[in-house]
Amino acid sequence: MSRKGSTPQRNVLPDPKYGSETIARFINMVMKSGKKSVAEKIVYGAMNVIGEKNSNAIELLQKALDNVSPAVEVKSRRVGGATYQVPVEVRASRRMALAMRWLIDSSRKRGENSMPRKLAAELLDASESRGGAIKKRDETHRMAEANKAFAHYRW
């Protein structure tokens, strides 16, 4: 572990089409193997699909992220010989990162024929509080609720 402390968080430039930092971060998380143009096509394609069904795609993305973002999660903490799953609150930056990651992962598992359609369908579902990403959030909250007794082991 580094002794110099944590590195400062780098700021992300807003995306060229919508001028939104959130969408720029989303594109970066969709990206695989440095292929940013492919990731942009996927995200902008999904936004276009959403735009056909819904008036404001950016608002819908924000609503989906808010719905999926977890309030608490569990972290492993070793006490004596036992390992406890201790519930801890999630800070805002990690909350957004987890929400984006879960949306992308669950959209990749969907059955639609192209990634932009999969992502659009998952975003629409998440904005209406259903879908794979919402299940993941609920599962995380359930784990935290089940291990509430170990909350005093927080650090």
Curated annotation (Swiss-Prot):
Supply the gene name: rpsG
Provide the GO biological process annotations. translation
List the CDD domains. uS7_Bacteria
Name the family: Belongs to the universal ribosomal protein uS7 family.
User: Cellular component terms, GO, for this chain's entry?
Assistant: small ribosomal subunit
Q: Which domain of life is it from?
A: Bacteria
Write down a Pfam family by its short name. Ribosomal_S7
Recorded hits in InterPro entries, A to Z, give: Ribosomal_uS7, Ribosomal_uS7_bac/org-type, Ribosomal_uS7_CS, Ribosomal_uS7_dom, Ribosomal_uS7_dom_sf
Under the heading Gene3D superfamilies, the entry gives: Ribosomal protein S7 domain
What name does the UniProt record give this protein? Small ribosomal subunit protein uS7
Which key words are in the record?
A: Ribonucleoprotein, Ribosomal protein, RNA-binding, rRNA-binding, tRNA-binding
Source lineage:
Bacteria, Pseudomonadati, Pseudomonadota, Gammaproteobacteria, Lysobacterales
Quaternary arrangement and interactors, per the entry? Part of the 30S ribosomal subunit. Contacts proteins S9 and S11.
Q: Which organism is it from?
A: Xylella fastidiosa (strain Temecula1 / ATCC 700964)
State the protein's purpose: One of the primary rRNA binding proteins, it binds directly to 16S rRNA where it nucleates assembly of the head domain of the 30S subunit. Is located at the subunit interface close to the decoding center, probably blocks exit of the E-site tRNA.
Under Gene Ontology molecular function, one entry of this record is: structural constituent of ribosome
